[in-house]
């Protein structure tokens, strides 16, 4: 599976993002509060039907995630309009829809919902029992089968530990990636 492009409109009521992905490594860089973590979360939520509750409690107007899976291009489109959220899978170039859209009735949230972790937790629990109906089963199953991306968070304050005090210095992003790859994926 390859991520090709993501467009997010109206995230939290004021953030719009459009990112075209490269075929190899992609880095998201920005100041605090610019939406880096939100973009990564949304990508994960869009590709995992078990994470639909997170999309239900996140304010946005439209999310479009373009992917290639098994050599076929798809556009995953999630929209919130009023009291409904719909999630469509569109096979690019198809003359008719291959997948029935997922439809979710959105619950009203109290004022200050975003700032209250207890409200968010309760809302997630209310949506946790979401199950596809008979028409939505093919869509839900497709989403379960899509491989999930590997997201590697890098913190610029990471240091390498060494017995030599001269080597206890901050690591660059490239050094962090090499360290993680060598530690976790070497045989």
PLM features per residue range, with description:
Residues 84-187:
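Electropositive, glycine-dotted interaction segments
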Residues 3, 60-62, 147-149:
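Extracellular structured ligand-interaction cores
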Residues 11-12, 45-47, 132-135:
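Short beta->alpha connector loops
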Residues 17-21:
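Conserved A-loop
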